[in-house]
Structures are given as C-alpha cells and as structure tokens.
Amino acid sequence: MLKLIPVFLLLLASCSAGNLESRHSSDLESRRIRRIAVLPPADSGPRPRIGTPPGEPRPPDRDPDEILARLLYPALSALPNWQIVSESEVREASQGISDADEATRLRRLGEAVYADAVLVGRMSRYRERVGDEWGAKSPASVSFVLRLVDVRRGDVIWSANFDETQKSLSENIFVIGSIGERGVRWLSADQLANDGVKRAVGQLHQLIARVS
C-alpha cells in the first residue's frame, strides 16, 4: 500500500468539467515538457466486418484508436508554444518497434524523435448516431482516455477522461452551455470525439504553456 502513496501525491491536482475529467502531476513544472509525440495505435490486423440490424448503430470501419489519433494531431498542432512531432516522423520512427510492449514502444519512440513526452490515446467507446443531425433515433456516444507519459521517467504526468452520450436540451438542461459551440443539432461520433479532444488538449496546453 505504501508504494502507491508517491503516485497518489503526484496526481493531487485535478480538474473536472462535466463530461471531461483531467489530472496532472504536482511537479509538472520541473518536467520541462516542450516536445510531444503521439503514440500510434499498435497494428492489430484488419478489423472484422460485423453485420448490424437495421436501425442500430453501425460499428466504425476504422480502428477507434486510429480515429482518436487522427483527431489529436490537428488539435495539438493548432496551438502555439509547444512542439508536436509530425505524424510522418512518428510513423517512420515506430516501424522498427511495433512488436514491443506499449511501455517499450513509448520509450523507444520518444527517444527516437527526441520527445520529452508521448501522448497515448485509447478509445473505449465509439458509437455512431442513428439518424441525422436534426433527428436522431439514437445519439452518438464516445468515451476515451488520454495519457501523457514522461519519456525519461516513464510515468504519467497528465491524463484526461472524456465520456459523453449526447443528450437533448429536454433531457438535460445543463447542455445549454454547449449550444453556443455546437448548435442545436445531433453530432456524429466523429464530431463528438473531436469536441472532447479539443477540450482535453486545450486543458493540457494551458498547463504546458503556463510552465513553459
């Protein structure tokens, strides 16, 4: 039990905003994170095609983790005062380490591209809406976790958890705050995930920019 105490102390600072929760290490300033790479998903082979009954949410044709990585790059690159390793450089560097376990892949990748930290994303739920943006029989539902890992020490220094199933204003009056950004419409799963990614990355940027 005592071994867990140092980790707990590093994660005292936390933030919650509705469907997005994040935590960061209390010594983030001393880490001097300047250059960040995104860990590409491990290649698990072709995804099986699964039949879906009419009117039910269709599973994505793409790997949900690939979808998340694709959304992360523009969100990260759009913000100043940090360096984001390009996707092409990351994929080239990761070709020779794809068979290693995640911790080894992360460390080797970070060292290969001279990154201070590596961002790891995992999509745990990606369910598309049934219907269109003006009338959905079933809303989009997305859940993902982001972890920023210090390459040198190998520990998690920031994490974010996004979990949302879109609700109408009549179901939840608290969604009124997002109407100005999203409008009164039903989002696709991509749009919902992108909204969560931008918010999470924005929180991370405030922390990194603040200590840079």
Segments from the language model and where they lie:
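Short secondary-structure boundary motifs at beta->alpha junctions and helix caps
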Residues: 137, 150-201
